[in-house]
Curated annotation (Swiss-Prot):
The keyword Endoplasmic reticulum applies. It is found in: Cell projection, Cilium, Flagellum membrane; Endoplasmic reticulum membrane. It comes from Mus musculus (Mouse). The keyword Protein transport does not apply. One of its GO terms (cellular component) is plasma membrane. SUPFAM superfamilies: Multidrug efflux transporter AcrB transmembrane domain. This is Patched domain-containing protein 3. Residues 339-496 form the SSD domain.
Amino acid sequence: MISSKVAPGEEEQGESPSKVELGEAEEQREAPLEGQLEAVPLDEAGPSWTTGPPLERLPPLGQEAPPPRRCHTNCLEAPLSRGFQRFGATVGANPWLFLLGPALLTASLGTGLIFLPKEKENLEEQYTPIGSPAKAERRFVQGHFSTNDTYRFSASRTSSETNFASILVVSLANSLLEPEIFKEVSKLDQAVQALKVVQENGTQILYQEVCAKYKTLCVPPNPLLFSWQHNSSLNLSDLTFPIHNTPTQLIYLAGFFGGNVLGQMTGKSQRLVESRAMRLLYYLKTEDPEDSERSQAWLTHFLDHFNDMKSSLTLEEIEVVYFSSLSRQLEFEATSKTVIPLFHLAYILIILFAVVSCSRLDCIRNKMCVAVFGVFSVAMSVVSGFGLMLHLGVPFVIIVANSPFLILGVGVDDMFIMISAWQKTSLSESIRERLSNSYSKVAVSITITTITNVLAFYTGITSSFRSVQYFCIYTGTTLLFCYFYSITCFGAVMALDGKREVAWSRWLEKPDQKYSSLKKSCCVPFGSLIDKHGEDNHPMNLFFRDYFGPFLTTSKAKFIVVLLYIFYIISSIYGCFQVQEGLDLRNLASDDSYITPYFNVEEDYFSDYGPRVMVIVTESVNYWDNDVRQKLDKCMTQFEENEYVDKNLTEFWLEAYMQYMNSSGNNPNDKNTFMNNIAGFLQFFPIFTYDINISSSNEITSSRGFIQIVDVSSSSNKKRMLLKLRSIAENCEVPLMVYNQAFIYFDQYAAIIENTVRNVMIASTAMFIVSLLLIPHPVCSLWVTFAIASVIVGVTGFMAFWNVNLDSISMINLVICIGFSFDFSAHISYAFVSSTEPSVNKKSIEALYLLGYPVLQSAISTIIGVCVLSAAKAYIFRTFFKIMFLVMFFGAAHGLIFIPVFLTFF
């Protein structure tokens, strides 16, 4: 990412052009023996990652040597620096080899892009925890209980999501409990059921053919609407909620009506005074694969023609929104198409930034073309990394589409560092020497930052979310290619451009009557010849040395910085307790998707009642034993007394069976009597057939009941509800299990914090170890750890203020945060502790002078790389920008403001 620039005085001093031909070495230096240090004049050495602190002068003979200033542990860094020095010389001597080799490798690996997935992405597999309890619970339910959607369908008894279409109707008046509004809703219902699909072979698919049925009729989309359609005299002003009693049946209204105003109690229900919204649910056949395929064809037709159908009905009393079991998948796949145009914009912006950053008025030292190729080399790394992963069969998920934007911003940082080091070399040296010197100064630093960032990503492989795993694998691998191409083909391009510098310099110095001095002055400002001793300091470096650094080290500025940090950390900690957990499934679609208003209406009017949860007796127990029944009844009571359960809506076959046995005068405590009467009971209550699993040996191996969940609109309530219900089941004396298909997604709320903390701890530990091994000063490791923790707290806290949930997508960014925090803090703190300045304030100023601009440049380039995602219409892309902006902003603030000030206090 970023690297320390060479210190002032590190520029190689060349001789005048009259003594030495350009492009040739001043003189042949004697190479140091293996293991020896090459002598460097004291005034030419400064702190850098590759040279360490300046060498000490030997004391005069007879005087005691002063104590060393600090511990210096460059046992790994020094050999790496020497190795890169040799490698740079090799690249400089063979530029075409190192240019064409990576190009051929990219072309070869790029063939893997033909394996980009063309099939649907499984949302459950990618965005729910691996090995979650709910998935094991589902396997148990599927293995012990059956359903029948062609004869006796029950939505609460299904173990996985069925095919369905859903319409939410909202009254424009205060209440829809009026005959006129019911007529309009009935007209809408009839139009939906009249939809038919004409297939290519001419056959038709009718709703009545694919609907889930109870006996011979399609399951009603709304039980009250169905009753009113068959009995228009039904008094809509005399209803009770959540269950309405009629002389012939009980009508279950919970979940079908929302925005209710309730009156006085009537038994276990309350009078329904007003209701603002109604739900219509059209369940379709799912169990048989052929039936499911036909159902999905009907649903596709429903989605394609619903808006036209709605317009033709001219609905005046109601507003409607719609959704289907296919919608989430289809809309999620559509979001990937919205981000493709942003790739082009991102590359244009980065190229412009690179050109501006690398342009010089001096046409010899100008590196605009080199910068453009640097961006191109980043694109090569994306092609190579993605191609390799696809060749290896690593799944490409949509969230991976964020990766190229990040790689683009990160990759050009290495380019800036290498160009900066090259500009510090002398034109009097050979190309081989110049590249060797450049590599020795920056390649180790680039290596360290690459290792830390790649380690941060690869720790994401330990996540329980496959989408996080795949994103981290793709991005970490691509970063390795980005690093490899930087030190090979980009270095080769710098070497080739160095030959251009030499050729142009010779042309400018050559007396030629055909070229006027005016033309020469256009290439060399003010007509001066090129400086062979290296480029002068960049104006931004001077800004940090002469203005920003001295200002930041004043007493008033330090006081303000401390207050600012206190405000920052308090706000961040407060935000950490406000952040919402889990991925809201509506966020998988684009902002202008039709499912967004559907979920908004559902949240506004239907959040009071959640799913019906199965309470499953997982083993064979003696139901005829009164003690066992009491234990089971005690557990059911504990469920009903939970704040998230409506105790009046419990459904359990055993309770109904005990009433049946008592009314018939049979003894429920006798095993034979208990078992022999179940068949007769099921004839009266056939729906319970699917709740009792009786083996061939006439033994109840498992059974289930149902409880109604309420008040779980927020992710925190869903998490607490899930954990509480499982705790009750686990502590029950009878072996119990709770399950609903929604738990598959609810499990992410329980797993996300655990996964985030684990990944952050693993990555932070890895960063700490790397800093101890590769940064030659132990004190730096402490400041690196402090900065990582501080930035993570800040990013997490401010996520809440920016309406970003802690989910699998933001968890990726928190892992990224660790790598960037390391980069920003490690360079500044090391430059500080390595400084030879006499006072802490001057040490801080020198650190900012050497590294302030690289830190700022790194942050800006990365933000530019991802800023185009802010224009995306999809949450998963926009969130990536938000968190990366926070990471860059807070990381740069720590590197440029907080750490330089805090270091002066110790």
